[in-house]
Amino acid sequence: MGLETEKADVQLFLDDDSYSHHGDVDYADPEKFADSGHDRDPHRLNSHLKVGFEDVIAEPMTTHSCDKVWICSHALFEISKYVMYKFLTVFLAIPLAFAAGILFATLSCLHIWIIMPFVKTCLMVLPSVQTIWKSVTDVIIAPLCTSVGRSLSSISLQLSHD
């Protein structure tokens, strides 16, 4: 439990087909990502996700655990992240993709067949409504406001200091 002077390296060996190559890739830099094969996030929707060990667990310089503990925790972190992600995607990815597909199909159908025809109908009717509203304003509201304004403009107040 003393001060460790030697640095130890951690290496995980996984099959190329079964593990994502994006573990330490900065998604904001496309040049680093170009050689990693098929890009599953071409629009960088999840570039904010940082799930590297150093981004989650860090020890300050004044308090370090033993190198073996650090190495084992790093290895367990990477393995558990890998296994849990695979486990969750096996059980959740297909049902959630199905639900998202139904949701987006429903929203698209509503937008195409209900919302846009309603908006277009309103835009077709608005010029005639605008003409009617202008006539009502000119005939009723404008004279009323003018007479009220003239009546109230003749009122004067005088304050006296008694």
Curated annotation (Swiss-Prot):
UniProt keywords (A-Z) are:
Cell membrane, Cytoplasm, Golgi apparatus, Membrane, Nucleus, Phosphoprotein
Entry membrane topology: Peripheral membrane protein
One of the GO biological process terms? insulin receptor signaling pathway
Question: Per the record's keyword annotation, is Transcription included, yes or no?
Answer: no
Q: Where is the signal peptide?
A: none
What residue ranges enter the membrane without crossing to the other side?
A: 87-107
- Tell me where it mainly resides: nucleus
Q: Which Pfam families match?
A: Caveolin
Q: Which residues lie on this side of the membrane: Cytoplasmic?
A: 1-86, 108-162
PROSITE patterns under this entry?
CAVEOLIN
> Which residues are reported to carry the modification Phosphoserine?
20, 36
Q: Which InterPro entries match?
A: Caveolin (IPR001612), Caveolin_CS (IPR018361)
Name the source's superkingdom. Answer: Eukaryota
Record's comment on post-translational modification:
Phosphorylated on serine and tyrosine residues. Phosphorylation on Ser-36 appears to modulate mitosis in endothelial cells. Phosphorylation on both Tyr-19 and Tyr-27 is required for insulin-induced 'Ser-727' phosphorylation of STAT3 and its activation. Phosphorylation on Tyr-19 is required for insulin-induced phosphorylation of MAPK1 and DNA binding of STAT3. Tyrosine phosphorylation is induced by both EGF and insulin.
Q: Give the multimer and partner information.
A: Monomer or homodimer. Interacts with CAV1; the interaction forms a stable heterooligomeric complex that is required for targeting to lipid rafts and for caveolae formation. Tyrosine phosphorylated forms do not form heterooligomers with the Tyr-19-phosphorylated form existing as a monomer or dimer, and the Tyr-27-form as a monomer only. Interacts (tyrosine phosphorylated form) with the SH2 domain-containing proteins, RASA1, NCK1 and SRC. Interacts (tyrosine phosphorylated form) with INSR, the interaction (Tyr-27-phosphorylated form) is increased on insulin stimulation.
Family classification: Belongs to the caveolin family.
* Task performed by this protein: May act as a scaffolding protein within caveolar membranes. Interacts directly with G-protein alpha subunits and can functionally regulate their activity. Acts as an accessory protein in conjunction with CAV1 in targeting to lipid rafts and driving caveolae formation. The Ser-36 phosphorylated form has a role in modulating mitosis in endothelial cells. Positive regulator of cellular mitogenesis of the MAPK signaling pathway. Required for the insulin-stimulated nuclear translocation and activation of MAPK1 and STAT3, and the subsequent regulation of cell cycle progression.
- Please give the name of this protein: Caveolin-2
Q: Which organism is it from?
A: Eulemur macaco macaco (Black lemur)
